[in-house]
Regions:
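N-terminal charged helix/coil linker that caps or initiates catalytic domains
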Residues: 1-28, 248-256
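A short, aliphatic-rich alpha-helical micro-motif
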Residues: 22, 111-116, 268-270
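Conserved N-terminal Rossmann-fold NAD(P)-binding element of oxidoreductases
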Residues: 30-31, 54
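Hydrophobic/small residue at the entry helix of a nucleotide-binding pocket
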Residues: 35-36
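Conserved S-adenosyl-L-methionine
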Residues: 45-50
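Glycine-rich phosphate-binding loop and adjoining beta1-alpha1-beta2 segment
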Residues: 53-90
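E1/E1-like adenylate-forming module used to activate ubiquitin-like modifiers
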Residues: 91, 95-99, 103-104, 114-194
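Flexible, polar/low-complexity N-terminal or interdomain linker segments that lie immediately upstream
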Residues: 221-279
Length: 279
């Protein structure tokens, strides 16, 4: 008789031991939008034992173009609560926790401490740097993703004492210098591709695989399939600064939104980054 996770268990890299690791894992997904929705669906299906879902926003009609976990009946309702309801129907064996409010300086440590790993599905610098700094302080892995039109980025931070988000992006750009998807748009399926990549990297971390994107930034361009991997190194000074303060470094503008950190041209000017063409 087939079991729910039989296809996982048949893999040498997973097996019964790996599936047990997945069952015991605790993952917090912050942002149940374009990135969070596909990631949540696959992590739920994979059998992650505890999934936290945090998002203060309500489902709107413009979300349905890419946030396919929701439907028209969810319009006007909180995303975290709707996601929990839909995911429960996908896998009743796992525990789901909904947090229908925003991550803040006041609650970040408490929420992140409860989980092994944080999947960043946010769209603003304020929350992203808050997640990053708390993950450094609490020694938690952060799985990152971002979107821009037909492009996306994925990386894994703080894995096995590896580089952090601030090693790649030490400080946010000035407000208004980088637009968000509500201003420039994003192809819906790109959200799905990058969100699934985040779910994949999350499972790699849970399974303790050596191939996780630690110290590597995957840049995906679905329009022309010119994909690249950028190698970057750990900046201990940035990490030590966070640990010395013992708290997150505030972002001056809490409304500074972003869906894509830097263009490939901007990244290529960084001398600490090495490009690898993966076409």
């Amino acid at each position: 008789m087939e079991t729910r996770y039989q296809r996982h268990i048949q893999l040498d890299e997973v097996g019964t031991t790996g599936q047990e690791k997945i069952k015991k894992a605790k993952v917090l997904v912050i942002g149940a939008g374009g990135l969070g929705c596909p990631a949540l669906q696959y992590l739920t299906a994979a059998g992650v034992g505890l999934l936290g879902i945090m998002d203060p926003d309500m489902v709107s009609i413009s979300n349905l173009q890419r946030q396919i976990l929701y439907n028209e009946d969810d319009l006007g309702n909180n995303k975290a609560l709707c996601a929990k309801e839909h995911l429960r129907k996908l896998n009743a064996e796992i525990e789901l926790k909904a947090f229908p409010w925003a991550l803040t300086h006041d609650n970040a440590a408490e929420h992140i401490a409860e989980f092994d790993l944080v999947l960043d599905g946010t769209d603003n610098f304020y929350t992203r740097y808050l997640i990053s700094d708390q993950c450094i302080l609490l020694n938690k892995v952060m799985v990152y993703g971002a979107l821009y039109k037909f492009e996306g980025q994925v990386s894994v931070f703080n894995y096995r004492n590896g580089p952090s988000y601030r090693c790649l992006f030490p400080s946010p750009p000035q407000a208004g210098t980088i637009p968000n998807c509500s201003e420039i748009g994003v192809l819906g399926v790109v959200s799905g591709i990058i969100g699934v990549y985040q779910a994949l990297e999350t499972l790699k971390v849970i399974l303790e695989l050596d191939t996780a994107l630690s110290g590597k930034l995957l840049c995906v361009n679905v329009l022309n399939h010119q994909n690249s991997i950028l190698d970057f190194v750990k900046n201990q000074k940035e990490i030590d600064q966070i640990k010395k303060q013992g708290k997150t470094i505030p972002i001056e503008n809490e409304d500074c939104f972003v869906d894509f950190e830097l263009s490939l041209e901007q990244l290529s000017s960084n001398e600490k980054i090495m490009w690898i063409d993966v076409r």
